Amino acid sequence: MKQQRLGNKEVSAIGIGCMNVSWIWSNGAALDPVQRLESAIPAIHAGLDAGITLLDTADIYAPTWDDVGHNEVFVAEALRTWSGTKEQKDKVLIATKGGITRSEGEVWGRNGSLDYFLRAAEASAFRLGVEQLDLWQHHRLDPNINFETQFENVMVLKDRGLAKQVGVSNYDAQQLLKAIEIGGTPDQGGLVSIQNEFSPRYRHDLNVLEICEEYG
C-alpha cells in the first residue's frame, strides 16, 4: 500500500475513520452504535490486514454525552485483538482529537484552555492504553480564547511528552499558516497534520491542501 509521511512516521496513505462505530448523524440524531459493534472490529482487522496503519478517532466520538471516549476504547480494543505481530502493531498510528466538549443534556461546547487540553490528552491516553499519544489534534477552535494562546497550548502537549506529535482540525488556511508560524513545520518538530473535510463534493479547503504540500 502507498505510504505517506506523517511527521516522523510513515503511514498508509489510506486511513480508517472510526467515528461511525460510535456515532453517526442521521437527520440530526445519533444512530445506535450497538448495531455496528459486532462487525466493526473484524472490519478494522481487515483493514489492518490489508496494510492500513492509520486509525482516526476522537474523545468526543460517543453515542451519548456521558460516554465520551467510547470510540477511543473501541479503537484500543480493535488493535489489541488484532492478530498482527508486535512489529506490525507498532507501525499503526492512532490519531485522536480533543477540544470539543459534551455535557449533560447533550450541551456542546469548546474548550481551548491548557488545563482542559492536559486533562483531555491524559484521558485519551488512558483509554487508548498508551503512555504517550501517537498524534493529538486540536479538534476545533474555542471562540472565547485567542488563537495564539490556543495553539501554544497545543504545542505544550508535545513539549510535556503527552503526545509524540500534534496537529489540528477544522482550521482554515490563514489559521493553519499562523499555527505553522507559532509551532513550526514538521521538519522543525512542530505541526504535522491538519484534518479537514475534503472530497470531490467539498473542495472549499483546496488552499489548505496546497499549504500542506508546500510545508510537507
Give the ranges of each region predicted by the language model.
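A structural motif
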Residues: 52, 130-133, 163, 191
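Active-site mouth loops of central-metabolism enzymes
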Residues: 20-38, 103-118, 139-145
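Acidic (Asp/Glu)-rich catalytic clusters
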Residues: 8-10, 49, 76-93, 125-129, ...
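Short, acidic/polar
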Residues: 32-48, 111-128, 173-181
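Conserved, mostly hydrophobic/aromatic
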Residues: 16, 40, 47, 55, ...
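Beta/alpha (TIM)-barrel catalytic core signal, keyed to glycine-rich beta->alpha loops juxtaposed to Asp/Glu
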Residues: 23, 31, 141-216
